[in-house]
């Protein structure tokens, strides 16, 4: 189910896949990717309070990267849902970008129970041993716990937004269909349709009528992993839903972009479309009261 997305993120040049996975979750991330892309964005932490925190979710402790303006409270909240490779330097950087704009941004490690991605020697092994074993139900519970944590630690849950990328883009749609506290959501190249199983019993387009927050979907027209037909069907289901959140939702397709066009650390990065998508995302959150 995830192979095209994975292939689109892995450059077609010789390099160690073990090194890539380890670097993605570790401190040597930048060193591993800078030779691939000189456009990698690094946002400093000046004026910010950044840390890894522990969030209690059921019987588990879920680590999360958190960034917010230093010394501030009662902040709007953005939950950042990681891509297929987990919480790595790019996801942390996105949190800092939001924090620079005045948000409490937090990215929980939604693979925490299933294992450490850096321990797997290949992308295929990572998918088989970790990603495929993460049930949607667990993800929703951990995201709910993250929201509660933010509300008790300086966040204003009346101004709650969620955004996610790749694997996390799909989860963004699902969470916006689940949690009534979400004011707005932005899903970056997340699947809206696909195979179902015990771990993923339904897809976003199955529950479009249950959408509780206006959601902006940002997609690439050349994304081999997400068909334009599935996006057209999602638009149709949103239009037919009749709810305000569904009516206000929007799907934008960048014709010349592929999957992961926002991932500035990969060759898939398309700067013009990434910049436009970021501007749209920030405007979306502000328009819907997440500021």
Segments predicted by a language model, with ranges:
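C-terminal catalytic histidine-bearing segment of alpha/beta-hydrolase fold enzymes
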Residues: 244-291
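Short beta-strand element of the alpha/beta-hydrolase
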Residues: 74-83
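N-terminal secretory signal peptides
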Residues: 1-15
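N-terminal cap/lid segment of alpha/beta-hydrolase-fold proteins
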Residues: 39-70
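Short beta-strand/loop motif that positions the catalytic acidic residue
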Residues: 211, 217-219
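Primarily recognizes the serine-hydrolase "nucleophile elbow" in alpha/beta-hydrolase
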Residues: 145-207
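N-terminal export leaders
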Residues: 15-30
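Gly/Ser-rich "nucleophile elbow"/oxyanion-hole loop immediately N-terminal to the catalytic nucleophile
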Residues: 121-161, 290
């Amino acid at each position: 189910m995830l192979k095209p997305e994975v292939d689109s993120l892995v450059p077609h040049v010789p390099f160690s896949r073990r090194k890539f996975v380890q670097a993605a979750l570790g401190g040597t991330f930048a060193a591993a990717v800078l030779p691939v892309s000189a456009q990698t964005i690094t946002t400093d932490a000046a004026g910010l309070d950044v840390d890894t925190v522990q969030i209690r979710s059921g019987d588990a402790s879920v680590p999360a990267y958190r960034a917010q303006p230093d010394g501030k409270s009662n902040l709007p909240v953005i939950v950042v849902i990681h891509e297929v490779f987990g919480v790595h330097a790019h996801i942390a950087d996105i949190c800092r970008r939001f924090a620079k704009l005045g948000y409490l941004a937090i990215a929980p490690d939604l693979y925490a129970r299933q294992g450490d991605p850096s321990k797997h020697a290949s992308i295929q092994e990572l998918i088989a041993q970790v990603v495929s074993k993460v049930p949607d139900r667990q993800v929703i519970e951990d995201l709910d716990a993250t929201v509660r944590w933010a509300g008790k630690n300086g966040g204003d849950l009346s101004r709650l937004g969620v955004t996610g990328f790749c694997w996390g883009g799909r989860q963004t749609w699902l969470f916006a269909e689940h949690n009534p506290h979400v004011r707005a959501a932005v899903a970056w190249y997340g699947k809206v349709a696909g195979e179902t199983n015990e771990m993923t019993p339904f897809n976003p387009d199955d529950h479009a009528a249950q959408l509780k927050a206006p959601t902006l979907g940002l997609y690439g027209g050349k994304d081999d992993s997400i068909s334009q037909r599935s996006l057209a069907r999602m638009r149709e289901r949103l239009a037919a839903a009749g709810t305000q959140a569904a009516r206000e939702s929007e799907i934008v397709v960048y014709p010349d972009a592929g999957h992961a066009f926002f991932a500035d650390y990969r060759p898939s990065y398309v700067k013009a479309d990434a910049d436009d998508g970021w501007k749209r995302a920030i405007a979306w959150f502000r328009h819907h009261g997440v500021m």
